Amino acid sequence: MGLLDGKVALITGATRGIGKAVALKFASEGADVAFTYLNSYEAAERTVREIEAYGVKAKAYVSNAGDFAQAHDVVKDVQAEFGRIDILVNN
């Protein structure tokens, strides 16, 4: 039983560095993880597979966090796909 079982996290910029480390840690604690990326579809797909290896749900969304309309759309899409957002990490 993980600290974040049943929670949904949205993390911006999680295909590398701190964002990816946070995504993997949250997944290891039981959170489903939605995350954004800007350029590399391949890196996003690798990250999805790494997160899913923890037995949780993962989905990548291409989005520029600096663009308000795109950020708004991602929030709506994540809520539709996951039902809610419990944790937000703006990386």
Residue ranges and their predicted role:
Residues 29-46:
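Conserved glycine-rich Rossmann-like NAD(P)H-binding loop of the short-chain dehydrogenase/reductase
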Residues 5, 54-57, 76-90:
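A glycine-rich helix->loop->beta "capping" turn
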